[in-house]
Structure formats: C-alpha cells, structure tokens
Amino acid sequence: MTEPAQWKIDFVKNLENEINSRKVAAIVSIKGLRNNEFQKIRNSIRDKARIKVSRARLLRLAIENTGKNNIVKLKDYAHGQVALITTDESPKKIYDILEKSKTKAPAKGGEIAEEDIVIEPKETNFPPGPKISEFQKAGLPAAIEKGKIVIKSEVTFVKKGDVITREKALVLKDLEIYPITAGLDLIAAYEDGLIFNKDVLSISDEKIMSDLASAFLGAKSLAIEANFIVPEIVPDMISKAYLEAQSLAIEANFVDEKNIDIFIRKAFINASAIEALINKDLNNEDITDKKEEKAEEKETSSDEDAASGLGALFG
C-alpha cells in the first residue's frame, strides 16, 4: 500500500489543530467563487474567523481524527469544492456575517439562474454596430433609436432554474446586469456536540423570538386551563379566580363592598333599558292616536262632501 505524501499528512494534522483550537468548525462551499472574491471575504472576516481551503477527502479525514464529541457527523457535509472555517463566534453569527458579505457578480456562462432574469425596456450606451446583432441573436428585442441601441420591450431573458449560456452571460455583462450571488455558502457548523445545518442557521432572530413568544403563550394558556401551577402563571390564576368569584357573586346577587359598583351599574343599565322600552311604547301609542285622528278627519270630510253634493243636486 502506497504511503500518503508527507504534505498530505502535515496538511490534515494542521486542519485537526485548527478544529481543536476553536469552539466552532464550519464547512462552506466555494463553488464558482473567483479568487479575488474569496480573498476579499477572507480579509473581511480575518479578525473573527480563519478559512482554509481543502480537498473534501482530506477535510473529512481531519474531522474524523479530532475526536471532538459528535463532530464526526460534520464530515457528511464535506463534499465538492469546500473550505473549513474555524471561529469562536457562534454558528448563527458567522452565518450572518457570511451572508452579509455576499455580493452580486456577473455570470460567466454555465451557472443556474437563481431567479428570473428580466430585462426592462431601456436605452443602452452602445452606438449602432455589431452589438445589436449580438443582442438580437441572444433573444433581445433590440433596435436603433436616436443613434443608440435600445431594448424595445420587457423580456424574461433567462428563467429561474435555467442555465445561463455563455452567449447570454456576455450580453448581461454588457448591460451591467449581475445575476450571480457571490460569497461563501455555509453548509453546516459544529459547536459543543451539535451540528447546525443551513436550514437552521438561516432562520432570522425575529423569527426565533416570535416562535419562542408563541410557544410560551401557548404553554401558559395550557397550564392555566389544566390548573397546573407554576410561578409564571400564578398572577394569571389569581386574576382568573377573582373574575370567576365576581361572576358567581353577581349571579347569586351576593353584594359586598367589592362588587357593589357592579350592581349599581347593572341596575342603571336595566333602568335605562326599561325607560327605553316605555318610551318606545309611548311613541307607538302617539303614532296610533294620530292615525286614528286622521282617519276620523277623513271620514268627517267625506260625509261633508257627500252632503254638499246632495244639496247641490236637489237645490
């Protein structure tokens, strides 16, 4: 069996020391990241974390050799083009730092569109020339207006999930449209025996606090309903018992100095309701009387008209 090269042995040992020297070890994807972009990110987080690019197989071997509790599960995420990050910051904080460091970059061709790439109608800075045929060949409704190449109408240039061809990548660069998110993509992180994947780390602080508050209120409500006494619900239980006692006293017409104002308000409300009913009945009687008076007046008027007619007939 061939012995591994000494540089590989030394490199793996160096990775082991890195992992053991910090509380947190994370695996990040560097796929598609240009060297200048990588160096810029490395410099921006230098005071918080260290980054080492490694072959995935060597990184998996180093993770196995560290002996940290449960860290061996982290090697399942070491595939493809990856790097190791070690830090004393929390996994969530280092994830947020990496997300904020991401920038938009031009497509080179061959990338998958992260979302629909829509080009709006616009005037470009290009004069008439070979560019117009390049734009048209790539699928843009290009024309010449006032000595400039213009895009005549909105077009979905590349649909989400489609491959950005080299031809279209060049057009996008000409139009200064940068559709690629460039940065280190944190895949998973280890801390104190736990593995945190991207799905967990991507949850916002606001979402975490909202979920905790909802869970607390739900548990509190359940404890109150079940009469399960814990310190957090004692004030609520006292308030609930007081309100139930007040309600029972009112139903039983039991008056004391604590609830007499409730009985007074109740009596006032009842009196107001009775007064309203009486006024309604009186109004109804007035309306009936007026209708009867009008009917009598109408009958009298009819009788007088009839008598007048007969008088005129018989002279």
Curated annotation (Swiss-Prot):
Pfam families documented for this protein: Ribosomal_L10, RL10P_insert
Family: Belongs to the universal ribosomal protein uL10 family.
Organism this protein belongs to: Picrophilus torridus (strain ATCC 700027 / DSM 9790 / JCM 10055 / NBRC 100828 / KAW 2/3)
Compositionally biased spans, kind Basic and acidic residues: 287-301
InterPro entries associated with the record: Ribosomal_protein_uL10 (IPR050323), Ribosomal_uL10 (IPR001790), Ribosomal_uL10-like_insert (IPR040637), Ribosomal_uL10-like_insert_sf (IPR043164), Ribosomal_uL10-like_sf (IPR043141), Ribosomal_uL10_arc (IPR022909)
Biological classification of the source: Archaea, Methanobacteriati, Thermoplasmatota, Thermoplasmata, Thermoplasmatales
Task of the protein: Forms part of the ribosomal stalk, playing a central role in the interaction of the ribosome with GTP-bound translation factors.
Chain positions covered by the region annotation Disordered: 287-315
Keywords for this protein: Ribonucleoprotein, Ribosomal protein, RNA-binding, rRNA-binding
CDD domains with a match to the protein in the record: Ribosomal_P0_L10e
Gene Ontology CC entries for this record: cytosolic large ribosomal subunit
UniProt signal peptide: none
Oligomeric and partner information: Part of the 50S ribosomal subunit. Forms part of the ribosomal stalk which helps the ribosome interact with GTP-bound translation factors. Forms a heptameric L10(L12)2(L12)2(L12)2 complex, where L10 forms an elongated spine to which the L12 dimers bind in a sequential fashion.
UniProt entry tagged with the keyword ATP-binding: no
Official protein name in the record: Large ribosomal subunit protein uL10
GO molecular function: large ribosomal subunit rRNA binding; structural constituent of ribosome
Gene name tied to this protein: rpl10
Listed GO biological process terms: cytoplasmic translation; ribosomal large subunit assembly
